[in-house]
């Protein structure tokens, strides 16, 4: 497997719709204001967080069960900023919609700007032939409220191309998150 460069990412986005909408350069500021960077980087793509959030509150004192998750444990927020309570988490989604090629595995890593503030971004790998908006999980590991900015960079996608095509892709096996749009809760 080899990591793919900015040239490859740009070509795949423009010719094959791998990332939509696609920002072909790294943006660090807009209209004289600084933003957390997003867009193409040397060997990755920095994704943005959309303005849709589900903030975990557990007002119902439910047990967190991935097989039977209580959607009522979330408060829906639509805003340019999301405040995550101390020691809690929020779900969001990327602005970008992804279409991963059959011979590519995509790994997501959180941006250091957030990590240095105690905010951890978690995303599982984007498997070969998966497509959709990426559901992002933000963990606030601090004892203070934490702020997430919509429409700014939150994580970096790294694209790993295999020498050999997989036998069965995510699409082939009918993965449960195939084609997801919006913030998607756990499914079993």
UniProtKB/Swiss-Prot annotation:
- Please identify the protein, giving its name as recorded: dCTP deaminase
Q: What is its EC number?
A: 3.5.4.13
What's this protein's function?
Catalyzes the deamination of dCTP to dUTP.
Please state the pathway this protein functions in, per its UniProt record. Answer: Pyrimidine metabolism; dUMP biosynthesis; dUMP from dCTP (dUTP route): step 1/2
Its BP terms in the Gene Ontology are: dUMP biosynthetic process; dUTP biosynthetic process; nucleobase-containing small molecule interconversion
- The reply to whether Hydrolase figures as a keyword in the UniProt entry is yes
Keywords attached to this Swiss-Prot or TrEMBL record, sorted alphabetically, are:
Hydrolase, Nucleotide metabolism, Nucleotide-binding
Instruction: Tell me the active site.
Output: 137
Domain of life of the source = Bacteria
Kindly state the subunit structure of this protein: Homotrimer.
Q: Determine if Oxidoreductase is one of this entry's keywords.
A: no
The record ties this protein, via Pfam families, to:
DCD
Write down the NCBIfam families for this protein, in alphabetical order: dCTP_deam (TIGR02274)
Q: Gene3D superfamilies, from UniProt?
A: 2.70.40.10
The family note in this entry says:
Belongs to the dCTP deaminase family.
Instruction: List GO molecular-function terms, semicolon-separated.
Output: dCTP deaminase activity; nucleotide binding
The residues the record assigns to binding dCTP are 111-116, 135-137, 156, 170, 180
Give the reaction(s) catalysed.
dCTP + H2O + H(+) = dUTP + NH4(+)
């Amino acid at each position: 497997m080899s990591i793919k460069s900015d040239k490859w990412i740009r070509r795949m986005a423009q010719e094959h719709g791998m990332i939509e909408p696609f920002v072909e350069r790294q943006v660090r500021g807009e209209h004289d204001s600084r933003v957390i960077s997003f867009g193409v980087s040397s060997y990755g793509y920095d994704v943005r967080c959309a303005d849709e959030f589900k903030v975990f509150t557990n007002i119902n004192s439910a047990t967190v069960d991935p097989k039977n998750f209580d959607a009522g444990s979330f408060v829906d927020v639509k805003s340019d900023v999301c405040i995550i309570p101390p020691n809690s988490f929020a779900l969001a989604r990327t602005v970008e919609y992804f279409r991963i090629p059959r011979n590519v595995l995509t790994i997501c890593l959180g941006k250091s700007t957030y990590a240095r503030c105690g905010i951890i971004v978690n995303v599982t790998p984007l498997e070969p032939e998966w497509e959709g908006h990426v559901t992002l999980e933000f963990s606030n590991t601090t004892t203070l409220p934490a702020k997430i900015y919509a429409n700014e960079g939150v994580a970096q996608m790294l694209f790993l191309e295999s020498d050999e095509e997989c036998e069965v892709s995510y699409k082939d096996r009918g993965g449960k998150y195939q084609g997801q749009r919006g913030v998607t809760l756990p499914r079993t």
